């Protein structure tokens, strides 16, 4: 696709807490003229469509309805949130086998419908499931994007904003690597109002140990939320809306997403979180951050962790 049509259509596959939060965020922002909700639980998709329809007098007109995989045929964007949720005490990587099975039953009927748009994947473990979507679909890597570390980077910016009493939108900082336990804060490139975060921290008496604790807090925040209320969904729903907006409005926005590595950071044949330019044709360019030697090692170690789980998961799926 060279550009988006005037009438934009999005299909959401998976109407759980994340999916419905994403649908609500899209409705609030008035993004896309047609929004289809697909899930095996039809009563929920019908109910959500009716509920979201009621918001249109306050937002923007939109055709919202419960649909089928066949509705993907003329969609611009298919967003996959379907999958088993992460339970208390469970890592994202623990979900791999059951969610690979679920994903394999989704991608084929989407592609068989004649869909020729962009896949955006958010189901966990998202880096692995994004890779699997790319493999199962046969689509170009630029048209299969993961939510990656978009939510984690938002958490980092919020935490740094609190620490230094600035608007999180004025913080330019990224979490990179796996969306999960091996992720890391790329502090070497992080800035607040063009000034390096470490310089600002030093001036305010915030030590490297303090920054490391802040990073740990970001890494573990999902577990904190899951333990308190069972799941995370508002943050990731909003992150998905932001990525969708960049695609549908051809923004060429730099966002932290799950992108296919083809030599960047010394990595190949893996999807992993990195800043990238996102627009109407999908992922237009990876922004290869100038990481420190320590950060580059963390990136490569994170990729190695993902690749092992990915290979084991795909092998088990093939043996079934």
UniProtKB/Swiss-Prot annotation:
Keyword entries, A-Z: Cytoplasm, NAD, Oxidoreductase, Phosphoprotein
Pfam families linked to this entry: Ldh_1_C, Ldh_1_N
Pathways per UniProt: Fermentation; pyruvate fermentation to lactate; (S)-lactate from pyruvate: step 1/1
Any one GO BP annotation for this protein: lactate metabolic process
Regulation of activity: The quaternary structure is constitutionally similar to the active conformation of allosteric LDHs, and the regulation is independent of the fructose 1,6-bisphosphate-binding site.
Alphabetized SUPFAM superfamilies for the sequence: LDH C-terminal domain-like, NAD(P)-binding Rossmann-fold domains
Binding site for substrate: 86, 92, 124-127, 152-155, 232
GO cellular component: cytoplasm
Outcome, altering residue 172 to H: Shows a significant FBP-induced thermostabilization as in the cases of many allosteric LDHs, indicating the binding of fructose 1,6-bisphosphate (FBP)
Top EC class, one word: oxidoreductase
Catalytic activity: (S)-lactate + NAD(+) = pyruvate + NADH + H(+)
Active-site residues per Swiss-Prot or TrEMBL entry: 179 (proton acceptor)
Sites bearing Phosphotyrosine, chain numbering: 223
UniProt EC number: 1.1.1.27
Binding-site positions, NAD(+): 18, 39, 44, 69, 83-84, 105, 122-124, 147
InterPro entries found in the cross-reference section: L-lactate/malate_DH (IPR001557), L-lactate_DH (IPR011304), L-lactate_DH_AS (IPR018177), Lactate/malate_DH_C (IPR022383), Lactate/malate_DH_N (IPR001236), Lactate_DH/Glyco_Ohase_4_C (IPR015955), NAD(P)-bd_dom_sf (IPR036291)
Principal location: cytoplasm
Domain of life from the UniProt record: Bacteria
Residue intervals passing through the bilayer: none
PANTHER family given in the database record: L-2-HYDROXYCARBOXYLATE DEHYDROGENASE (NAD(P)(+)), L-LACTATE DEHYDROGENASE
Record's protein name: L-lactate dehydrogenase
Organism: Lactiplantibacillus pentosus (Lactobacillus pentosus)
Lineage start: Bacteria, Bacillati, Bacillota, Bacilli, Lactobacillales
Gene name for this UniProt entry: ldh
């Amino acid at each position: 696709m060279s550009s988006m049509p005037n009438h934009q259509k999005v299909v959401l596959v998976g109407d759980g807490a994340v999916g419905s939060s994403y649908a609500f965020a899209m409705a609030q922002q008035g993004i896309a003229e047609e929004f289809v909700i697909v899930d095996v639980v039809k009563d929920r998709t019908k109910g959500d469509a009716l509920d979201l329809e009621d918001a249109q007098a306050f937002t923007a007109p939109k055709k919202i309805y419960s649909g089928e995989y066949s509705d993907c045929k003329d969609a611009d964007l298919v967003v996959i949130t379907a999958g088993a949720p992460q339970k208390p005490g469970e890592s994202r990587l623990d979900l791999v086998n059951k969610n690979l099975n679920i994903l394999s039953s989704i991608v084929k009927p989407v592609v068989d419908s004649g869909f020729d748009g962009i896949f955006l994947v958010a189901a966990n473990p998202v880096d692995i499931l994004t890779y699997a979507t790319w493999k199962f679909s046969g689509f170009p890597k630029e048209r299969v994007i993961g939510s990656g570390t978009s939510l984690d980077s938002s958490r980092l910016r919020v935490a740094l904003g609190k620490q230094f009493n600035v608007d999180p939108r004025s913080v330019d900082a990224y979490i990179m690597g796996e969306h999960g336990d091996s992720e890391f804060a790329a502090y070497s490139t992080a800035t607040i109002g063009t000034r390096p975060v470490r310089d600002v921290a030093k001036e305010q008496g915030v030590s490297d140990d303090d920054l490391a604790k802040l990073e740990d807090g970001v890494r573990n925040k999902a577990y904190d939320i899951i333990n308190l209320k069972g799941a995370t969904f508002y943050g990731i729903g909003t992150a998905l809306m932001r990525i969708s907006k960049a695609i549908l409005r051809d923004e060429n926005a730099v966002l932290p997403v799950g992108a296919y590595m083809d030599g960047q950071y010394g990595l190949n044949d893996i999807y992993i979180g990195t800043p990238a330019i996102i627009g109407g044709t999908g992922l237009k360019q990876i922004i290869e951050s100038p990481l420190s030697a320590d950060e580059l090692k963390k990136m490569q170690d994170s990729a190695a962790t993902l690749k092992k789980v990915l290979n084991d998961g795909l092998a088990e799926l093939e043996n079934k």
